[in-house]
């Protein structure tokens, strides 16, 4: 895969992973009454890990699980970022905008990306047999 595409996918994955972990994980840690820097550190670790996973997996065709995982992470992250930031940019006064990305577009993109990764793997496998 082209290096520019790999960089773009990795950056989008890092941004989406950071924000999702910060807000969803931060809400869980809020109940335990933990300092804010722990939420930031946890979100940064998850973002770097997800970006590294996408960077390595986007460069080589993998097996079934890596294809499903990469498709799910990349598509889910793009859908989450679109659903999270889209309403903020289009309707700044709406306070429920980010919830669209957290509860609807992110999980739906994750599921559809996993299915797309499985279909892509099956197509590659079928073409390799011919």
Show the residue positions of the predicted features.
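Intrinsically disordered, low-complexity regions
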Residues: 4-8
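Membrane-helix interface/capping segments
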Residues: 55-65, 92, 125-128
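Membrane-helix interface and helix-disruption motif detector
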Residues: 25-38, 92-100
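Small-residue-enriched transmembrane alpha-helices
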Residues: 9-22, 39-55, 63-87, 97, ...
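Short, charged juxtamembrane terminal tails flanking transmembrane helices
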Residues: 1-3, 123-130
């Amino acid at each position: 895969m082209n290096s520019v595409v790999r960089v773009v996918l990795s950056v989008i994955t890092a941004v989406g992973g950071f924000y999702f972990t910060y807000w969803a994980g931060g809400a869980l840690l809020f109940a335990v009454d933990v300092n804010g820097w722990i939420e930031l550190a946890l979100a940064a670790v998850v973002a770097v890990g997800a970006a590294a996973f996408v960077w390595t997996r986007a460069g080589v065709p993998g097996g079934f699980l890596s294809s499903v995982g990469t498709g799910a992470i990349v598509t889910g992250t793009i859908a989450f970022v679109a659903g999270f930031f889209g309403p903020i940019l289009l309707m700044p006064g709406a306070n429920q905008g980010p919830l669209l990305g957290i509860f609807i577009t992110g999980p739906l993109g994750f599921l559809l990306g996993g299915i797309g990764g499985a279909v892509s793997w099956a197509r590659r496998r079928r073409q390799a047999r011919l």
